[in-house]
Regions:
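Hydrophobic alpha-helical segments, chiefly the membrane-spanning helices
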Residues: 588-592
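Protein-protein interaction/assembly regions in multi-subunit complexes
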Residues: 2-230, 234, 239-254, 259-280, ...
């Protein structure tokens, strides 16, 4: 259990006050620059040219990172920044999925800029406090907590007190209750006004570190987290000796973005809310299953990564099907990661009893799994026990490790075990046979502790494939063939062997093989909307352009991606309105 902290337990290092500012037509026209080494905060203006060219979100993040760095800047240099940027629509409660912010930095995995989108309350709270972006730069000399109070109008730098937890599910709870204010540690309204960015202790020992963005769940009286997961930005945060960034804000309203035509926004938002409610149960069932609804579809179409992406299907696939997760998810609690989202697809499993690690025997709330996690640490490792997936999901989150990179990396290790490249002597006794999720969990615990085989494993598949060839005499070409990464970033969880469109979606991207920009696997392989080379090439242009638009505006892609208008199929080029995957539900087996 975590202890109760009060603000008096935190040593104040510095404070800067600022004038609060209202949003006008989606913009505050300023960003906040924080130098944790100098313990300073300054406002930076946003020019009309910057707004016109870069819009917000990912665009602002990349522009600010460009201005802050030099060609020779490396990820662990003080001048590298972590930029959290919101678009003009971010936080608008009329529209489903408006809670997204984009995080940009130089990646410790690839060495080049990475961006990762994330839900939760932090981005909207920062936005409505009068900021279009936050820049974190420099390196602190002590473990530091940055507190942005958008209610009172100040930024404070605190030294992290002794005894503060390192693991996210406890740390975020301690900080939320401490910064809610004296005597307010049990007041739901005050607790809900706090959001925390942190990275767990696993990020100290691996380039796979994620940023956890917290939200206080009133119904559960507890903390939940969403991740900016790809590219290792949590590792950058820990390298800067930032224990956490805390924001406080009150007063979210229907028109906090100051839309030019709030009536039109409300009308269009209501239309989308209605379409989600009417169509979701007949299509992807996101409101009950979340992205885990993809599991049996991917297995049916030979696209579900199995045994380190060697196969795309297995007879045990139904053991991880969507209806399995629907029964495990808590259906009686709202699961949106921001106010006003009818999709509410951020499901959780409550009261899950852990079987391994430092919290063995404790019952916890597990955020997820999302499809990428269920596939990555499930079928990809030949793990078909939901409890194993939930265990790995929880510990990846609380240790601050990306589930996609961890799943792809562990799949590589298990294949190396099968090939005889790895032995008990080389893994410190850990059995990495296919399906042994407790062996995978031991790697994760050791990684978090910075010891034994976990430290080596945590370096990622690019390093491991080269290391096994040079140190263990493994066949270098074979190691390269089975190490699924691009530029050092592990591939996400779709079999792309027969999909040229998805291969391009993975390996023509600037930031490495992720599914954010060009998620074409469904359009290409399930619904057969891209029958020619020309169609695939065209999709590799328009699809990432449209997906990037969401990242500029502050919107989640899923209300568009997973709900199609009922009459969508009647229109020409329906795939350009919606990817149209819901139609496949009739072709997928369902339990009797």
């Amino acid at each position: 259990m975590s202890r109760a902290f009060d603000l008096k337990d935190f040593k104040l290092l510095a404070e800067t006050r600022f004038e609060k500012k209202e949003i006008h037509r989606g913009y505050a026209m300023r960003t906040m620059h924080v130098d944790v080494g100098a313990r300073t905060m300054k406002e930076k203006p946003v020019s009309e040219e910057m707004k016109a060219k870069f819009v917000g979100g990912k665009g602002f993040g990349l522009r600010l990172l460009w201005d802050a760095t030099r060609p020779e800047t490396r990820w662990d240099d003080p001048e590298n920044e972590i930029v959290v940027a919101m678009g003009p629509v971010c936080g608008n409660t009329n529209y489903p999925g408006s809670g997204k912010s984009l995080v940009v930095s130089l990646s410790p995995m690839t060495g080049v800029p990475i961006d990762s989108n994330v839900g939760g309350y932090f981005g909207p709270y920062l936005k409505f406090g009068g900021w279009d972006a936050l820049e974190l730069q420099g390196k602190a000399d002590v473990e530091t907590i940055v507190f942005i109070d958008n209610v009172e109008g100040f930024v404070r730098f605190y030294e992290s007190p002794a005894g503060l937890q390192e693991d996210t599910h406890l740390l975020a709870d301690e900080l939320t209750r401490a910064f809610a204010g004296s005597g307010a540690s049990d007041d739901p309204t005050e607790l809900q006004a706090i959001s925390v960015i942190s990275a767990g202790r696993g990020a100290d020992h691996s380039p796979m570190g994620v940023l956890n963005f917290s939200l206080y769940d009133r119904r559960r009286d507890g903390i939940r987290v969403k991740q900016a997961g790809r590219g290792g930005i949590g590792t950058v945060l820990r390298n800067k000796k930032i224990r956490a960034v805390v924001v406080r804000y009150k007063g979210v309203g229907q028109n906090s973005n100051d839309a030019a035509d709030p009536a039109a926004v409300q009308r269009l938002g209501l239309k989308l809310h209605r379409e989600i409610v009417q169509n979701d149960d007949k299509q992807c069932k996101m409101r009950r299953q979340g992205t885990a609804h993809l599991m049996e579809v991917m297995n049916d179409y030979d696209l579900l990564p199995t045994k380190n992406h060697k196969y795309g299907q297995d007879p045990r696939g139904p053991e991880l099907a969507s209806w399995v997760w629907e029964k495990l998810f808590s259906q009686h609690l709202p699961d949106g990661c921001w106010f006003g989202c009818t999709m509410a697809c951020a499901h959780a499993v409550d009261g899950f009893e852990l079987q391994t690690g430092p919290y063995k025997g404790q019952k916890v709330c597990v955020d997820g799994p999302e499809y990428e996690t269920a596939a990555g640490v499930g079928s990809n490792l030949y793990v078909y026990e939901p409890e194993g997936i939930l265990e790995l999901n929880f510990y990846c989150d609380t240790y601050g490790i990306d589930t996609i990179s961890f799943g792809t990396m562990t799949g590589f290790l298990m294949e190396c075990w099968e090939l005889g490249v790895l032995t008990p002597e080389r893994t410190d006794g850990i059995d990495l046979s296919w399906g042994n999720w407790k062996g995978a969990a031991q790697i994760l615990h050791d990684l978090a502790d910075g010891k034994r085989f976990g430290v080596l494993a945590g370096k990622g598949v690019k390093f491991l494939s080269e290391y096994f060839a040079s140190e263990y005499g493994a066949d270098a070409r074979l190691m390269k063939d089975i190490a699924l990464h691009g530029k050092g970033l592990e591939q996400s969880e779709y079999i792309s062997k027969e999909s040229l469109a998805q291969q391009g979606g993975y390996y023509l991207t600037n930031k490495g093989p992720q599914h954010d920009e060009a998620w074409l696997i469904f359009m290409d392989m399930v619904n057969n909307k891209l029958p020619t080379f020309e169609a695939k090439a065209e999709a590799l242009h328009y699809f990432p352009m449209f997906r990037t638009w969401f990242g500029l505006q502050g919107l989640c892609k899923l209300p568009w991606n997973d709900i199609e208008p009922a009459d969508n199929a009647k229109w020409p080029e329906s795939n350009k309105v919606q990817i149209g995957r819901a139609s496949c539900r009739e072709r997928v087996y369902h339990p009797v």
